[in-house]
Amino acid sequence: ASDVYKRQVMKYAEKLRKGDKVAIVSLSSGMLGEAFCSHNIEIGVKRLREYGLETSFMPNSLKGIEYLKANPKARAKDLKDAFMDDSIAGIICAIGGDDTYRLLPYLLEDEEFIDAVHKSPKLFTGFSDTTINHLMFYKLGLSTYYGPNFICDLAEISDEMLPYSKKAFESYIEGNEYREITSSEIWYQERTDFLKEAVGTERISHREEHGFELLQGKECFEGRLLGGCLESLYDILTTTRYEDEKAVCEKYGLFPDIEEWKEKILFIETCEEKPVPEQFEKEIAILKEKGVFDVVSGVLVGKPQDEAYYDEYKNILVKVVNNPDLPIVYNVNFGHATPRCTLQYGAVARVDMKRKIIKCEVM
């Protein structure tokens, strides 16, 4: 793979301002283009407008599931075009999926795209399969946000965005500080009905009983943030989901090498598939094999969606990591469970479990 995209010093995009235009891209699933998502478009655009932001749907973003599944090149083109367009200040992923790795050859062999990322860094946010896009940008030296996306957050079908997630999104807008992440006082079950008829219904919510939990290790630690969705990281390293995914990701050096993991804080969270404990154990074990737990300064683990396998996951983490000195903080509000905060790749996080806060800053 070419050295052109060897990691530079991190570049940080400017925050969004009133009047800015944001692009919506479908880099994974094409569901935003399906009729059953039309109400989401309406809700999301309205909420962005309330922030004084103009929405631009990239030309291929609404072409639907089948078309985008068959045309990774079209998905990649949207991302490139968004970077080439000076009128676009930020890029919001529509939603995750499971095959955005197919975009890598079209982007990481395109000098124009790489150049545009270096010369005009833009705010980029999303989670889940978007982990792959984040790691690509990390490799290119652009700091991005593991946080809200269009369908799940801006287009949340409750009357309002979920307050904790809303605050995370607002941190992308100039003038809003987002220095401290604390545990959300409530958590929400995943919806079973996302259709138009359910618009205006509230999610089932629960009082948070656990807060951030220190499973082991010292109470205070720090490091730059690096990580993503655990299943995405596992898929990069195996042929389990797609036969060619491991080879494609290896070709472009997508999974950070061991030097890169040194003194980082690894953040990981499980997806909506709610992996059974045996699968979770495999996913943690592969990171252990890679040596990640030997060199990072600590680990943040997201709350499992619907608190699935809550205690089993905790026990597996401690057992497989097998290093009692490594700090592991569990049940942090990021990723697939709602509500969600935002974590910035490459930002310095200072975790203080005496006060149960995570402070993040760019430096």
Task: Give the ranges of each region predicted by the language model.
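Charged helix-capping and loop-helix junction motifs
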Residues: 38-41, 72-76, 108-110, 280-286, ...
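Short, acidic/small-residue loops that bind anionic groups at enzyme active sites
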Residues: 107-137, 143-151, 327
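Short, small-residue-biased leader/transition segments that mark boundaries at the very start
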Residues: 1-5
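ATP/nucleoside-binding phosphotransfer catalytic cores, i.e., glycine-rich phosphate-binding loops
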Residues: 279, 285-288, 294, 298-363
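Long, hydrophobic/aromatic-enriched structural stretches that serve as scaffold segments
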Residues: 83-108
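ATP/NTP phosphate-donor binding region
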Residues: 9-88
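Oxyanion-binding "anion nests"
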Residues: 225-277
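Conserved anion/nucleotide-ligand pocket segment
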Residues: 145-231
